[in-house]
Amino acid sequence: MLSKVRIALDAMGGDVGPAVVIPGAAISLQRHSATEFLLVGDRARIEPELEKHPALKAASRIVHTDVAVSGSDKPSQALRRGRRTSSMWLAIDAVKKGEADVAVSAGNTGALMAMSRFHLRTLPGIDRPAITGIWPTKRGESVVLDLGATIGGDAHHLVSLAVMGAAMASVLFNKPRPTVGLLNIGAEEIKGHEEIREASEILRARNLPELDYIGFVEGDGIGKGLADVIVAEGFSGNIALKAAEGTARQMAELLRNEMQRSWLSKLGYLFARSAFQALRDKMDPNKSNGGVFLGLNGLVVKSHGGTSAEGFAYAIDVGYEMAHYDLLNKINQMLNREGGALNSVQAAQEAVS
């Protein structure tokens, strides 16, 4: 457990840049005083915002660059143009050099993943990293991955996601053996494509001590909180994420419209205001902001590009928690335990095949 967490922020990332990143960092610092910030970006744009937050200024150091990755840059373009010079790259580089424990960016997702994978590399036994989110549920929260980093994947990839997701859940939820489910079109063992059925067979056959595999989970099972960890390949995981976020916004809009429809509904709202506020807080996408790139040789957190300062603060909070509780070391321990969890999984995959 780290007593002091050093966080590198891509101050130029997102739709707004320093005007959101800096106040967001100030909000997070109020919750986690044992934090030091490396603010990477254009000094001329960072300093005016930083002057508004004396406590943050005292806990921060600026690394100047006027090069930023745009939202329209393709990953290959971002690597070619922004390598070694952009605010995104330099934030990741701080993690690589050990100057920061985690990097947080609201910038271009594809570029951030490409730069992170290129510069930090993946952990032994991990072929491809995953975007991992924290999902509000009826039971509390669940870890969901992959939310769009990799389209497709074989059984070994899905099992590696299960192992990494379980490591993150054990850190977040303080559970030594979190429950894990595979997202599928049905709960029956015969449902789904070959890769997901094979992954299920491997997880059952191996019975890993790091996780409790419960089987397939349908889409509605995510919100029900049927498992601490929900595993999906990136295509279906991203669709599930966008559908849930859209539904949350639609429900909030529908409720707001109905509450304003008549004087009677307005009166009813006054009596139930605390309940509606609790519901709104539960469904607030800002509070689920912060996708962790799992599978890399370093910690990187992706924030929504269009988030507010409060939303960006939640992404920083996620990075703080992951670094403070030493998630990377936890994943490495789980991968290497008993001769390597994934090596054992590979043997199980060959036996199943």
Swiss-Prot record:
One cellular component term from this protein's GO annotations in UniProt: cytoplasm
Enzyme Commission number(s) from the entry: 2.3.1.274
Pathway: Lipid metabolism; phospholipid metabolism
Gene3D superfamilies in UniProt: Isopropylmalate Dehydrogenase
Keyword Lipid biosynthesis: yes
Localisation: Cytoplasm
InterPro entries: FA_synthesis, Phospholipid_synth_PlsX-like
Coiled coil (residue ranges): none
One example of a Gene Ontology biological process annotation: fatty acid biosynthetic process
The reaction(s) this protein catalyses: a fatty acyl-[ACP] + phosphate = an acyl phosphate + holo-[ACP]
Single Gene Ontology MF annotation: phosphate:acyl-[acyl carrier protein] acyltransferase activity
Pfam families, per database record: FA_synthesis (PF02504)
Role description: Catalyzes the reversible formation of acyl-phosphate (acyl-PO(4)) from acyl-[acyl-carrier-protein] (acyl-ACP). This enzyme utilizes acyl-ACP as fatty acyl donor, but not acyl-CoA.
Protein's UniProt name: Phosphate acyltransferase
Originating organism: Bradyrhizobium diazoefficiens (strain JCM 10833 / BCRC 13528 / IAM 13628 / NBRC 14792 / USDA 110)
Lineage: Bacteria, Pseudomonadati, Pseudomonadota, Alphaproteobacteria, Hyphomicrobiales
